């Protein structure tokens, strides 16, 4: 079968969203492709807040003669690329063309050494993609991302917090400012100025809240005895795939090692289950994070690896 490649157009946002839902179900609800919420989060955070666009330059579609989507190639972070394919239409020729497009169009200049580089992700054990990447001269992977999941069927654990802490949905106003501040502290612990900037202008978080799947009642926070936000976990419930994804999850440095992130996740998963979710997901890029999520019940996983090629 022949496919036609073209660049992203604004009308494709909803089409790609539906494509990811459909192929996720085709793949038995395993994250072979992205879930719908990751696409939304990248568009409304990566592109809107972190200058990872424009979409018209960072996303390519392959379509059948009937105009149906067969595959999507997109970045997440500059130069780091993901291949999303309809499993029934996947061929070596199509995947080869997608990798070639990434090499040609979706590279970046490394901030560390100033060299041109391109990265493509592959699930470990995917012999077809790994053979293509080797043929194109990609280095064997060093960095990996785990996609962890658990069943939400059956009884789920109640959130447990230290005395004086409470777990609930995030409020607005001052609490939103505090949530933005803690996000900066948690993800940039060596840069307090970043946390202050996060709180001074919350436009970035308002952008995330524009994502179609965002729900305030699933934006979970743990609140300390003094009323400050101590930890958070945002849950994305998809009523088509009946899944719940945790992203992001973090705890303020001064409140860590109290089980607060786990409590937020458990609260979010229970709420999502009440809405109909039957499977929960959370991604991790480090051993400590993976260990935390395993304790929270996410004991099943598949691993993705980032292959990098240095360009001339």
Predicted feature residues:
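A structural microfeature
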Residues: 70-71, 142-144, 230-231, 261, ...
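Acyl-donor-binding surface of acyltransferase catalytic domains
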Residues: 75-165, 171, 305-309
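Conserved N-terminal entry element of GNAT/NAT acetyltransferase domains
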Residues: 1-27, 139-140, 151-173
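Conserved active-site tyrosine of GNAT-family acetyltransferases
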Residues: 129-133, 292-294, 298
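Conserved acetyl-CoA-binding loop-helix of GNAT-fold acetyltransferases
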Residues: 91-107, 251-253, 257-274, 291, ...
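Conserved hydrophobic beta-strand within the GNAT/NAT acetyltransferase core sheet
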Residues: 118-121, 246, 279-284
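Flexible, substrate/cofactor-facing loop regions flanked by secondary structure
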Residues: 154-244
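Conserved donor-binding loop and adjoining core beta-sheet/short helix segment
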Residues: 6-14, 18-112, 223-243, 252
């Amino acid at each position: 079968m022949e496919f036609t490649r073209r660049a992203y157009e604004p009308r494709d946002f909803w089409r790609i969203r539906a494509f990811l839902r459909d192929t996720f179900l085709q793949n038995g609800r395993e994250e072979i492709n992205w879930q719908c919420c990751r696409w939304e989060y990248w568009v409304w955070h990566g592109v809107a807040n972190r200058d990872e666009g424009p979409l018209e330059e960072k996303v390519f579609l392959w379509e059948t003669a009937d105009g149906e989507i067969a595959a999507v190639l997109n970045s997440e972070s500059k130069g780091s690329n993901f291949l999303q394919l309809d499993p029934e239409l996947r061929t070596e020729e199509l995947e080869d063309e997608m990798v070639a497009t990434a090499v040609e169009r979706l590279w970046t200049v490394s901030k560390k050494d100033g060299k041109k580089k391109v990265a493509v992700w592959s699930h470990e054990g995917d012999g077809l993609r790994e053979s293509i990447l080797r043929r194109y001269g990609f280095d064997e992977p060093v960095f990996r991302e785990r996609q962890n999941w658990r069943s939400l069927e059956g009884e789920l654990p109640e959130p447990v917090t230290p005395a004086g802490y409470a777990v609930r949905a995030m409020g607005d106003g001052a609490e939103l400012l505090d949530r933005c501040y803690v996000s900066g502290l948690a993800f940039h612990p060596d840069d307090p100025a970043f946390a202050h900037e996060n709180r001074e202008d919350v436009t970035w978080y308002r952008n995330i809240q524009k994502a179609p799947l965002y729900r305030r009642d699933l934006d979970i926070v743990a609140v300390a005895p003094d009323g400050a936000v101590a930890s958070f976990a945002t849950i994305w419930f998809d009523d088509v795939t009946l899944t719940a994804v945790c992203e992001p999850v973090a705890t303020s440095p001064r409140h860590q090692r109290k089980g607060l992130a786990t409590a937020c996740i458990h609260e979010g998963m229970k709420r999502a289950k009440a809405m109909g979710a039957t499977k929960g997901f959370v991604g991790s890029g480090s051993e400590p994070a993976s260990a935390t999520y395993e304790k929270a019940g996410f004991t099943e996983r598949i691993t993705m690896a980032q292959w990098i090629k240095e360009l001339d």
